[in-house]
Regions:
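A detector of single, family-specific signature residues
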Residues: 1-391
Length: 391
């Protein structure tokens, strides 16, 4: 067996080739991070092997720098292993007491790990889907947060330009209101609008729910409004609504891609009532391979949902707060998914009510339900069985 260790960096990659007997077949050599470098790597590997030899390629998970070099050995049909940099660091320290860390040393370390660590798992199609899901769900998370900030700006601007509007509509953040404010960004513009045009804008945007009487009500409120006439704020409001609409379209496109991958993954956890595609995809993406975790408690710790402990002498903390370490995306997905599951699933609803009856605050009770949900998800992913309501 031939082990190829690759230390990844932005502009070049250091490579080292080792046999399973520990013989150095190719000392550390460097290839540029381009097509010529990739093309030169494969003949070098083939030159060190015999037809019957198995080849293993290993590299560290270094974020976006490793994506392209990772795809090359996979496209060549070579089993490829992606290793956690922390794992590599600890392994290197176990080999020597010297504080030596260079790209050349890391390449040797990765090759040695491939030779000695039989528990490493190769990169598979499932790993690819997890990476795609992680990119998409995190991208969506950031877009949704960006949109939320813009919606706060809309609320702030309406308070300045037409504060009475909020009491006349179910929400400021609906299509009909955004259409109205895009056309008439302020009380003064609405007050001067022709009633027929105002009624048409509202009726078309609300699909007929807002009639002439609603248009009169809004115009009368605008004519008696205390809102300021500030052209700069009106322009900001129009542009902010335009940005929100663009983000809505982008988020919809992202969610479409997520749905396509989830159809391929076909995870059983989406059968849990209240656990939708979006939160389910985020949980799957952040956890990755469930077999990497010995128990559901390890996933809780990875998400930062385990209780912290502080003890010194006779002092022990009375209230254990969540550690809030690890993946904040996973923590967010689990906590929010739990809230919806507790609404739609009677078993979880009863469990949440039980914790609330014990006097626990709402968020504390939800955190207990979250632990229960993680254990359920872990069991379902390991067994592959869909969710069944307890009888």
């Amino acid at each position: 067996m031939i082990c190829v260790g690759i230390d990844v960096s932005k502009d070049k990659h250091d490579c080292f080739i080792l046999s399973s007997e520990g013989e150095v077949l190719a000392d550390v050599f460097t290839i540029p991070n381009n097509a010529e470098g990739f093309t030169a790597l494969l003949p070098t590997i083939r030159h060190c092997t015999h037809p019957a030899d198995k080849i293993k390629v290993g590299l560290e998970a270094t974020g976006h720098y490793s994506y392209n070099i990772l795809g090359f050995p996979l496209d060549c049909g070579l089993p490829t292993y992606v290793i956690n940099p922390l794992h590599t660091n600890l392994y290197r320290k176990s080999l020597s007491l010297r504080k030596t860390k260079t790209d050349r040393v890391d390449a040797r370390t990765i090759a040695t790990m491939l030779m000695s660590d039989v528990d490493l798992k190769s990169y598979t199609d499932t790993s690819y889907h997890n990476e795609e899901l992680k990119s998409l769900t995190r991208y969506r998370f950031d877009k949704v947060r960006e949109r939320a900030k813009l919606k706060q700006s809309v609320s702030r601007l309406v308070t300045i330009l037409f504060p009475e509007l909020e009491k006349l509509v179910p929400s400021l953040h609906i299509v009909s209101v955004y259409t109205l404010l895009s056309e008439f960004p302020g009380a003064h513009q609405i007050a001067d609008a022709h009633l027929t045009h105002l009624k048409t804008v509202l009726s078309d945007a609300s699909k007929g729910r807002y009639d002439r009487e609603k248009a009169i009500e809004i115009r009368d409120a605008a004519r008696n409004s205390i809102g300021s006439c500030m052209p700069a704020k009106s322009l900001e409001l129009k542009h902010t609504i335009q940005l929100i609409r663009e983000l809505d379209a982008e988020i919809a496109e992202i969610e479409s891609e997520i749905n396509s991958i989830m159809e391929v993954v076909h995870s059983p956890i989406t059968t849990i009532p209240g656990l939708g595609i979006r939160m389910g995809a985020m949980i799957l993406a952040e956890v990755g391979d469930f077999s990497n975790f010995d128990s559901a408690d390890k996933i809780l710790a990875y998400a930062g949902l385990s209780p912290s402990t502080y003890q010194s002498g006779q002092l022990t903390n009375c209230y254990s707060h969540m550690e809030k370490r690890g993946s904040r995306y996973l923590r967010y997905a689990i906590f929010n998914a739990t809230k919806y599951v507790c609404i739609h699933d009677p078993t979880f609803a009863a469990y949440l009510s039980k914790k609330r009856a014990e006097g626990k605050p709402y968020n504390v009770a939800v955190s207990h339900a979250a632990k229960k949900l993680v254990r359920l998800i872990y069991a379902m992913e390991r067994s592959g069985q869909p969710y069944k309501l307890p009888t």
